[in-house]
Amino acid sequence: MYGNPGNPGLQPAVLIHEGQITYERHGLRKIMDLGEWWFEQTKLPIPLGLDVVKASLGMDVVTEVKRALTESLRYAMNNPEEALRHAMEFARGLSLEDTRRFVYMYVNDYTMDMGVDGERAIKTLLEWGADERIIPRTQVLIL
């Protein structure tokens, strides 16, 4: 059990986005890091922030969306300061340094190509969800 049984007012929560960087400034403490837990369980990267295209739109649309996203990501990775200035528009009060830290937590080699480990991570997450009857079993096409 997480939290403090002696203090029912103390409630655990899942922090996402910039909360991962700023939680201590708000007097919060980390009980568990889900990314670390996932890696301990699977030895795989945690599958976050994926772009999904509905297959029924057809392969031409799927291919064009993938091309456009890849081009955009490549531009951002080749122009990091410009991309960071753009990200600051959505930074929800973060400093430039905190925004840089947050962006670089997630912009990495997996951003351009999640590889075999990334594919296994997605399939593992979906399998676990289906095993627990949270989601139906599904076939996934990863391009």
Predicted regions and their residues:
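Pocket-lining segment of extracytoplasmic ligand-binding domains
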Residues: 1-89
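Short loop/turn and capping residues at structural boundaries
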Residues: 16, 118, 140-141
